Amino acid sequence: RLYGKAGAPDLFLKHGRDTVASDLLDEMVRLRWMANHIEVPAVTHFVSTTDEAWLLMTALAGETAYQALEARPDERKTIVDALADFLRTLHAIPISECPFTSDHSYRLRLARKRIDAGLVEEDDFDEEREGWTAEQVWQEMHRHLPFMADQVVTHGDFSLDNLLMVDGVVIGCIDVGRVGIADRYQDLAILWNCLGEFDEALQDRFLARYGVPKPDPSKLRFHLMLDELF
């Protein structure tokens, strides 16, 4: 994070090589597209070479949703309501206007490549899958296929750390490199899982507020396992 002088915005600089450089390119083009639909950091500069990339962008104001939930336990219900409302706004963006694909078929192909290349961090799996190999996750995940996709514009990594809040309202999101058309459970599953750290009742409240009081458990499990591979 680069702190601006008085009256100037703070900035964030991301740098990476090889696959990370490719990820930064993905994030840059999505930031520019998302800026027409929802609050995201503004790209100020992007530079790339054959194997490196630098992305400079403005910093959003506020605190992360995780910080808000930690700091104000008595406000957790209203915070969760705000998260659900923001996700509904995101998912209401017309898919006809989105040029990016992030559906499960596409991400399965990427996940297979990551497994074969040994890039999956198996020691970072959720407690439910502690001790599993990436191949075990892959095999178990396929037990939940096929399913009928309910496509919307998704964030792709809709976690508490990627949502910024000011005065109880979600004002924007960050880390948008996975934005694209996919099943809505791509986002629902990740945030639902994050809220489990705080309270199962908050998980239920989030889904009900969003509009799925009776979620599809198979879709939840599939998308959580898919996320383990990234």
Task: List each language-model region with its residue ranges.
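Generic alpha-helical structural signal
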Residues: L25-M28, D81-D85, E135, Q139, ...
